[in-house]
Amino acid sequence: MKLMIFTGLFLFAIVSLIEAQAENEKPCLPEYKVCTHAPGNCCSDLVCDCYGRYKSGAQIGRNCFCLQKGVIYKREN
């Protein structure tokens, strides 16, 4: 009986460790990819920049993209 409990706990620990490793190895988001729902997933040389969308002074949405750190983007007319 003790052997069955020990084996079950051991298997549970191994499965938990494998899941934690898989989560840490998620690929990062490359430049210009949407990061609205995953702001911490941009690659290390990028930052998740968010911009609000407005219509008639009211915010209608928000977009976030993985962009280069320290770069300022300006709107073209």
Curated annotation (Swiss-Prot):
Source domain of life: Eukaryota
Entries under InterPro entries matching the protein: Spider_toxin_CSTX_knottin
The entry's keywords: Disulfide bond, Secreted, Signal, Toxin
A single cellular component GO annotation: extracellular region
A single MF term (Gene Ontology): toxin activity
Propeptide span(s): 21-26
Extent of the signal sequence: 1-20
Annotated source species: Lycosa singoriensis
Tissue distribution: Expressed by the venom gland.
Modifications the protein undergoes after translation, according to the UniProt entry: Contains 4 disulfide bonds.
UniProt name for this protein: U8-lycotoxin-Ls1m
